[in-house]
């Protein structure tokens, strides 16, 4: 989860590496190399396939979060912002918050996915060591719009639907996001969410994209060998 150059990168017999938590430069952009290509984490389980996707207007919760606050400190500002929100304006929202003792130690997997499917928004703070999380993709697949404070600059976030704001103004971010979801303007976002699930997070589509990258790599090698 550290966004470093992967093991084997300097081996002469390595043709191509598809990498989760792809290497980043100092500006949190994708580190462009001829040997590596970033791919999304996707969900931690495939239970989403059997769960009904409800319309936004029929969902029980405004926002949810079930997860840990790791000792690495990556979610400290998130926890402070969330505590402040609940204390000062918690009665203005419908939510479910549960803090757990570690990764995947909260709700049962299906129960967790069903919870996401019953929420309009999903709070998606950074992981223990990376800005990226399974939660972002699980939420997207369940139709719960992710709320983030920052994301790395990878191709698979470019067309993703999400709301962005600093955790210390979480109440403002949530209010604006929920109000937006009540307007007709949100249709394009929800349509984009569905297209994202059917394209970027679709197994067959991702495999096709990876094949294209492999073919492209073959072509580059063949072209360079001619000179």
Descriptions of predicted regions:
Residues 1-163, 181, 198-225:
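Nucleotide-sugar donor-binding catalytic core of glycosyltransferases
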Residues 175-196, 220-224:
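Conserved donor-nucleotide binding/catalytic region of nucleotide-linked donor-dependent transferases
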Residues 165-187, 211-214:
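C-terminal "capping" alpha-helix adjacent to the active site of nucleotide-linked donor transferases
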Residues 42, 169, 185, 194-199:
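Intrinsic disorder/low-complexity signature
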